[in-house]
Amino acid sequence: MTQDELKKAVGWAALEFVTPGTVVGVGTGSTASHFIDALGSIKDQIEGAVSSSEASTEKLKSLGIPVFDCNEVDSLDIYVDGADEINGNMQMIKGGGAALTREKIIAAIAKKFVCIVDASKKVEVLGKFPLPVEVIPMARAYVARELVKLGGVPKYRQNVVTDNGNVILDVHNLAILDPAELENKINRISGVVTVGLFANRGADIVLMGTLDGVETITQ
């Protein structure tokens, strides 16, 4: 199976965790896109979705799935999204698609976070994939200097503006041995909106696409 076929397999496998009559939290990216396709097949069985990006919102609407504003829901039964990296503690790096802040908000609201990935995303130590940090534009240089102090090599993601009107710094050369601590440290830097470490609120269930099929991992 190709990598995209593995992504499709986990996207459709996630339907098993969707409760009829609920609003579903939906992520962003190539794997989440397959889940949206799958969700379209049961659109008459769900109330709708809350989306983490304009791109996902557009796709959901194109499939006839109602999209609710995050402020319209008190909680979500489930949030389904991919990851750029995930470790054995189900902590993740996310934000390759620049939707990390909205993804983190939806993860916080959701009772259950189902992470859908292909096996290539599994790592022992987070950090080989550059760590995205969403930053208010006027603070870009200051935040970059602070990230250097933490041992990283930040690079400005050119020609990218988030759905919130901010910029992204991708932090290279990190071996993240304590993801929760680093998440807290970076989030305390003035001008940081959020960091793409999902460590304090990790996944509850991981669906991992392998050549032998979809593996379900729980804590």
UniProtKB/Swiss-Prot annotation:
GO cellular component term of the entry, any: cytosol
Pfam families: Rib_5-P_isom_A
Catalyzed reactions: aldehydo-D-ribose 5-phosphate = D-ribulose 5-phosphate
Transmembrane segments: none
Active site as annotated: E103
Function: Catalyzes the reversible conversion of ribose-5-phosphate to ribulose 5-phosphate.
HAMAP family the record matches: Rib_5P_isom_A
Name the record gives this protein: Ribose-5-phosphate isomerase A
Organism: Photorhabdus laumondii subsp. laumondii (strain DSM 15139 / CIP 105565 / TT01)
Designated gene of the protein: rpiA
